[in-house]
Amino acid sequence: MKNRLKGKTALVTGATSGIGEAIAGQLAELGVNLIITGRRKERLEKMAAVLEDEHNIKVTIGTFDITDRAACEKFINSLGADPIDILVNNAGGAHGVDPVYSGDFKDWDTMIDTNVKGLLTMTRLISPGMKKRNSGHIINIGSIAGHEAYPGGVVYCAAKHAVTAITKSTKMDLTGTNVRVSQVSPGLVETEFSMVRFKGDKDKADKVYEGMQPLTADDIAEIVVFVANRPDHVNLLDTVVFPVAQSAATMVARTSP
């Protein structure tokens, strides 16, 4: 596959683990300079040292909470005038599986603030530069939950449906420019996602992937890199990625233990 990404700069949010970490790693392999952000400073520093050493690229880290708009603005302003060619809005997550009549307000706020407002903030801060340069690519990490609803997912599904709408509307807003806008929407991916959703209950988290082979973070990263590496005139708007055992949000073929 032709490498069209070498020498570009990508900003990846939520890069300290899982899909974000995998995306950063695979972009680094193609010679992409990185700006990686998250809340775990030590983890970001370790990643930066390894990626710079192994791939001879520049890695900048940003330690802040994506839900803190002022912190986002301060960090982006600190980067100066160097262009960000690719924005990967990866930070997100689900908290709890409560039905709407007993949901936790704090969990709801966290999901909306992270999945929706954080994504909007980063897009608002970075897209003007892309528009001015008439070049760039915004890639949002969505979910099958952004295409289907399911029980116990009322706010997470709503948040990811919002991401789908934001992706489509952003593409429309940038019509007439050469800025590309994409979304990658995974199904079941085995990462820290379920541990966070079930608040550290490993037994419940493991059952999500029981009796089937889920996707890995690297599987999704490979798709993101593929989307980013298309020719400049090619825009993949939304790519849904399932493990072969999954056909819908709640339709999964499982084998007995």
Where are these regions (language model features)?
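Conserved glycine-rich cofactor-binding loop
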Residues: 9, 16-17
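Conserved glycine-rich Rossmann-like NAD(P)H-binding loop of the short-chain dehydrogenase/reductase
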Residues: 32-47
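The beta1-alpha1 cofactor-binding region of Rossmann-like NAD(H)/NADP(H)-dependent oxidoreductases
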Residues: 42, 63-74, 105
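Substrate-binding pocket helix/loop in short-chain dehydrogenase/reductase
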Residues: 98-100, 104-112
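Active-site helix of classical SDR
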Residues: 123, 159
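Residue(s) in the substrate-gating loop at a strand-loop-helix junction
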Residues: 143
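C-terminal helical subdomain
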Residues: 183-187, 191, 203-249
